[in-house]
Regions:
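Walker A/P-loop NTP-binding active-site region of P-loop NTPases
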Residues: 20
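A glycine-/small-polar-enriched, mobile loop at the entrance of the PLP active site in fold-type I
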Residues: 1-16
């Protein structure tokens, strides 16, 4: 569907909670992640946190690397030198989850956002475990924040939904999404 009043209200609410520009609702958190990865081209490289939700790892390793031709380097982002060392001329996205699932690792979002901007790389943060109540990645300069609404946003695991919010007024990014 191109529009739905309930989904529109959800997107507007999440955009407001995250201090963003534009939000998009999805049928699941993995669907939101998949939509972010669709912004990439074949042979693009992603630097990803080494401790991610298993569904994200499977999406990267079993689906997107095969169907889309991207490559992924998993690094421990608690040591920022690992991010710097993983950079290649094909790196187009940094994908961070903080705190991570399941080990609760914490990455410096402002440092990641600044590095991404300095290298013209899209920064994406899975904020599922923190929620916008505790942490607002867009306020640290992250380009896109996403959530699996099934977990803490829903509160009871009685719904399946996902959302992503764009944090900068980037018409090209909004149009692509």
């Amino acid at each position: 569907r191109s529009g739905n009043p309930t989904r529109n209200a959800f997107e507007e609410c999440m955009t407001s909670l995250e201090d963003g520009i534009k939000g998009y609702g999805f049928s699941s958190g993995v669907a939101a992640i998949s939509a972010c990865v669709e912004l990439l081209e074949p042979d693009d490289h992603v630097i990803a946190m080494d401790d991610l939700y298993g569904g994200t790892v499977r999406l990267f390793n079993e689906v997107k690397t095969k169907s889309q031709g991207i490559t992924v380097s998993y690094v421990d982002m608690t040591n920022f030198e690992n991010v710097e060392n993983a950079l290649t001329d094909k790196t187009k996205m940094i994908f961070v989850e903080t705190p991570t699932n399941p080990l609760l690792k914490i990455a410096d979002l402002e440092q990641i956002a600044n590095f991404a901007k300095a290298n013209s790389i899209l920064s994406v943060c899975d904020n599922t475990f923190a929620s916008s109540y505790i942490q607002k990645p867009l306020n640290f300069g992250i380009d896109i924040v996403l959530h699996s609404a099934t977990k803490f946003l829903g509160g009871h695991s009685d719904l399946i939904a996902g959302v992503l919010v764009i944090g900068k007024d980037d018409r090209e990014l909004i149009d692509k999404m």
